[in-house]
Amino acid sequence: MASRTKTGLMETPRSKPSPPPPRLSKLSASKSDSNSASPVPNTRLSLDRSPPTVNSKPTPDRRPSRIPTPEKVHSRLVKGTELQTQLNQIQEDLKKADEQIELLKKDKAKAIDDLKESEKLVEEANEKLKEALAAQKRAEESFEVEKFRAVELEQAGLEAVQKKDVTSKNELESIRSQHALDISALLSTTEELQRVKHELSMTADAKNKALSHAEEATKIAEIHAEKAEILASELGRLKALLGSKEEKEAIEGNEIVSKLKSEIELLRGELEKVSILESSLKEQEGLVEQLKVDLEAAKMAESCTNSSVEEWKNKVHELEKEVEESNRSKSSASESMESVMKQLAELNHVLHETKSDNAAQKEKIELLEKTIEAQRTDLEEYGRQVCIAKEEASKLENLVESIKSELEISQEEKTRALDNEKAATSNIQNLLDQRTELSIELERCKVEEEKSKKDMESLTLALQEASTESSEAKATLLVCQEELKNCESQVDSLKLASKETNEKYEKMLEDARNEIDSLKSTVDSIQNEFENSKAGWEQKELHLMGCVKKSEEENSSSQEEVSRLVNLLKESEEDACARKEEEASLKNNLKVAEGEVKYLQETLGEAKAESMKLKESLLDKEEDLKNVTAEISSLREWEGSVLEKIEELSKVKESLVDKETKLQSITQEAEELKGREAAHMKQIEELSTANASLVDEATKLQSIVQESEDLKEKEAGYLKKIEELSVANESLADNVTDLQSIVQESKDLKEREVAYLKKIEELSVANESLVDKETKLQHIDQEAEELRGREASHLKKIEELSKENENLVDNVANMQNIAEESKDLREREVAYLKKIDELSTANGTLADNVTNLQNISEENKELRERETTLLKKAEELSELNESLVDKASKLQTVVQENEELRERETAYLKKIEELSKLHEILSDQETKLQISNHEKEELKERETAYLKKIEELSKVQEDLLNKENELHGMVVEIEDLRSKDSLAQKKIEELSNFNASLLIKENELQAVVCENEELKSKQVSTLKTIDELSDLKQSLIHKEKELQAAIVENEKLKAEAALSLQRIEELTNLKQTLIDKQNELQGVFHENEELKAKEASSLKKIDELLHLEQSWLEKESEFQRVTQENLELKTQDALAAKKIEELSKLKESLLEKETELKCREAAALEKMEEPSKHGNSELNSIGKDYDLVQFSEVNGASNGDEKTKTDHYQQRSREHMIQESPMEAIDKHLMGERAAIHKVAHRVEGERNVEKESEFKMWDSYKIEKSEVSPERETELDSVEEEVDSKAESSENMDQYSNGFSLTDHTEDSGNLLLKEQHMKKKKPLLRKFGNLLKKKSTSSSSQK
């Protein structure tokens, strides 16, 4: 358009000047008369001022008419005025056209500048977008790389976990092979674990409820803690009162027992007289018949008990052993009865004489029965009071423990819920951070686009085309809003789920309270049953069955609780799935945002294309600019929509941040209750960090479930082993070995626990002293209390050491040691737990062992006292005493051997530990430090859990100690009662006729006692599997019942002592004691055999470890030797480098001398023409040769001095090389002179061969030296070889040169050759002598070194 306007404007002035000539003619015709000649000068001026185009036309009219007429002048004037007007118009038009052109050019320049600026801005925006996209891609790549690394790390952790699982599975297979009969129990445990898994999925729904009730639970816990403190104070007061009463009653009982014993001894003295009597045969036969009847009744009872035992056999395999022992005892009782029958046949002849004495004895017996009945009433009242107090205490303790367990369960569920929430919040925060980054990048793009928009505001005309794009953006906004609403609805659903979980927790608390009430009712029923148990044996059996049923009900209640927990776990898993879905939705939102970004990129590409079109077609710029403005307006609208979306997202973020703050406040409150569950929290935190990768989270959950299953299986195995240990009734020696093993394992845990190990060894020594000091039971009890106190202090020290271990994690320098310790900890975890359980059981069995030992000691005293009274059977008793003394000596020797074996075991175990440490150090150096760090953290978490368990066990041990003290008081009371019995038995001398019936009833009572003990032990073993603490309390109650039963039995013995025969009683007691001693000896021998077998196995292990140690020592020696060789090679390399430098210096000096010699040879050849100067030249050459030899000697001496610092072997090799180098130089010099003198081809070739041989020798020595040099210096030696080769080539060239030179002069100097040869022959031996002297000097210096 601009070109067209220009052409139109330029054509207008050209068309206008064409018509003036006709107009001038007309005017000249009309106005010729009126005008005068006066205005001529003006016309000239105007014509002179006119442009040349106008002046050129009138010139042809002027030339022909030089004398103008007035008409012509007038016409000219008119034409001039017209022309001037036309010219003025044309000039004005031209000015206007120029102004328009300038304006158009300015507009064009402005438009072009605007376009350029817009293009620049668009390009800058595109570049920034590209940069943002590249940054996004980098971030995505880095995110993917981090994901890949995390996946790799998780895979490595999973591999390590799988390895652990493989090892644990191997251990489980070994355990299953040993316990094939326990598969049913394991299957039941696995089913329970599956139920627990199912319930764990439900625990996530209960997390918010647990948080809401956390404060209430804490308040309730504080109230219960206060109540527990009050109850504990009351219990202490009651225990003090009971202790005082028990001590008093024990003193009285001891006095009564001593009296009864004295009376029994007197009766035994009288039984010898009664044995002569035969009158009591008939009564004894009746008693024998009664015994038979009683035996049949006992057999019926045995059948009943066997049926009950068969029912319990399916649950516990170890009870069969106890039944076998009971059967053995019964068989022994039957044997004793047979012996008694034989003795009764012998006593038939004697009993006739004892009839007269029976009447007086009956009167005495009646008096004693009255006294015994009075004592029984007193004892029954006392037992009732004690039982009532203990039952109240047990009730209170059960309440406290149940409350504590409930609180712990609630705390665990809270912690799990909080951890899951933390994981969810962390994922949300990551997504929000990504969104914030995208929003920041979008804002940057917006700022840049706004800059471009400010420049392009003048082009906002086409807004209609952007309406479609704005509608699409609005649709996307609506989609985002819907997604946000969905998120909010999900949050609301989570809140509702939390409310539901809170309600469930409230229901659980109510159930727990109902269970507490039911437990109270059960305790009341137990009291009633205890009162009814005194009626007879049938009531006792019914009571036991009721207890068993109640224990089953408790088991069922515990299983119901487990099922509830499984449901809670299922709910938690469902929550996890919901969170995964939320994360998937968030990822989809991110994908939508990425699509929008791509859409922006496409729109920017379209803008670029349109800007290129604007450049190509300037005429269509308005349309293109309209399109651009339309696109920019659409972008603005889209940006506004994006800003709105970002604002909405920021609001959502703020709401999420508020929720996070609320959650953090709740977590801070809950973290105060997490002190006891640090290990579980760490594991859950690891799971929360792993939530970034959903697939890995599932695998980790599976691994955790597997570990929980393994742990529960291990717990079942541990419980079974505890039952086996309780049935086996391990002796004190086994307890001592267990303590030693615990000490050794604690040494393996850390070398810093030496003080703890020493104190545990002191405990082991104290436990050994229990075996040596069986007679001094009171001292043993005191020492046991001290040892337990020390154990508590040691456990505290273990906690301190565990804290120090946690601080040692920060020390990176000790990573290898940490890895070694982690493996040691892995291998010893299982044994540590086993031995802790064994200690708990062993501490429970110590009281029983002590009571047995007291009974044995008392029986020994009775035997020694009976030895004085027995006159007829003194020989038999003396033999028995001698056998007992021998057995006692054997026992002492066995005990000493046991101590020696234990000491040896400790020494062997120490050696094994040292060897195992060496082996582990050498093997663990190849492992990775990262895996060891992870394993170390896991092991430390487990250590914390185990230390907590140890603390609980220490508390249980303290309770056991207190209860053992109470039992000790009861034992003292029993001893007092026995003393009273002895006094009462002195009065029973007249009751010899009733001895047979008394013996029968005693046997029956013993059988009943054995059966009672068996049933009680069975009950205790079954209750131990349910709850250890409740089992301990019940065992104490059973022991109290046993004591009461023993008191009742003593009373029965006292009542029936009038009907017993003293001699039969002595024989049965002796037999029983002998059988017990034999059993003890057999147990000791078995223990010795086991110790010997262990010693043999330990010796084998020591031998294997010694072989390993020798192999490792050999490897270490080889390693040291290799290191020494490396050091020697390094020193050799250094020396070789030094000597190479020296040789290089020698080479340079020799080359310089060779050049000098060659110059001198040339000068000498030139001077051969002068015969007068021939002698002088030879003398000069000889002197120079001597100078050269002296120089070589000096160099050899200096080299020898420097070689004194190196090894002899290197000195010889290097000196040989150094010695050869000057000799070779001398030989080369001589050969060159010979070549110059002789000038014969075959001699020259021979000399070259000699040179080559010398060079080969030097090369061989150099190769030998190179073989000794380390590979690091081979490159330097190769360079030296190249230099030697170059030297050889230069020497050959010089020889050729000298040969050529000598051949040219052969014709001229043939007469002087003979003289030259003679002089050279004189020189050669001198030079050889100098070389030999140098060799001798070098060898002498080396020999002196």
Swiss-Prot record:
Q: Where is the composition biased (Basic and acidic residues)?
A: 59-74, 319-328, 1200-1218, 1265-1276
- Source taxon at top rank: Eukaryota
Query: What family does this belong to?
Result: Belongs to the WEB family.
Q: Ranges of Low complexity compositional bias? A: 24-38, 329-339
* Location in the cell: Plastid, Chloroplast
Supply the name of the protein: Putative WEB family protein At1g65010, chloroplastic
* UniProt keyword annotations, A-Z: Chloroplast, Coiled coil, Phosphoprotein, Plastid, Transit peptide
Q: Does the keyword Ligase apply?
A: no
- Residues found modified as Phosphoserine: 1279
Q: Name one GO cellular component term.
A: chloroplast
Record flagged with keyword Plastid: yes
The Polar residues compositionally biased stretches are 1291-1304
Region span, Disordered: 1-76, 319-339, 1194-1221, 1265-1345
Q: What is the lineage of its organism?
A: Eukaryota, Viridiplantae, Streptophyta, Embryophyta, Tracheophyta
Question: What's the chief localization of this chain?
Answer: plastid
Extent of the transit peptide: 1-79
Give start-end ranges for the coiled-coil region(s). Answer: 78-147, 252-1162
The species is: Arabidopsis thaliana (Mouse-ear cress)
